[in-house]
Amino acid sequence: MKRIAIYADSFNGKVGQSLAYMNFVGLFGIPRLVTPQDDPQEIVDSCDALVIPGGADVNPLRYGQVPHPATGRANVYYEFMDAILAPKFVEAKKPIIGICRGMQSLNVMFGGTLYQHIKGHTQGSDRTATNQTLFTPSGKNYKVNTIHHQAVQKLGTDLEMIGATQVIEGCNSLYNQSGLVSVTGKDDKGKDVEFYAFVEAFKHKTLPIVAFQYHPEEFNCPFAIQEINKVLNPVIQEENEQDRQEVPQVTEEDTKEGN
């Protein structure tokens, strides 16, 4: 099985990670908690992938902005591993999965910026409530639990949006709406809709990197599982695609000839 590194968090004088994250990572391999005290090169050499989980706000100084008054205190543990560990996985071209803060941090690593304060989005919200619609390029929609104090503003270099959620009323009060992404999709009834959106998921165009703004670990989101498997098992995905293309298509004429 694959060994998948995931940032450990520090709280109440202890180091650990939530059961939801550990169980979710366990769907894809064996989780390994990593800390700033670990040797980053040993982690890269011994692990097949890295998960950057959710957490506190990303330090705005990393993307050249002055902290907003409502911007929270950065997680020093996570910021250190963002600087020391994550770039080594990028350099090694090993898979990286970002969730919530992890997505924001990856965006910043590739030169992107963030909206620092999203009104109405707090970590005190119900993390299991799938109350927003995720629009994807395939046209298939998913219900997701999007709760995030910050969000992608400008996408980083070579990052491509693969999911978007509609900006809820009141969220854009602190920044220029022209900076938001305009998206056209289909609603739950199949009707075309156009709206301002948050980037809710992205992938890297050439590297095995995928990230989600929402929290797929709370409900084992099928879209996230599908996209994560694409970066963790690209050979299997390519073989499946090839198999689907090589399956003969039976037509009505074929069935008539066989009778």
Regions found by a protein language model. Give the residues of each.
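Active-site loop->helix "elbow" adjoining a glycine-rich segment at hydrolase catalytic centers
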Residues: 101-103
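Catalytic beta-strand/loop module used to bind and position nucleotide/cofactor moieties
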Residues: 211
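N-terminal beta1-alpha1 cap of cysteine-dependent amidohydrolase-like domains
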Residues: 1-99, 108-115, 119-143, 149, ...
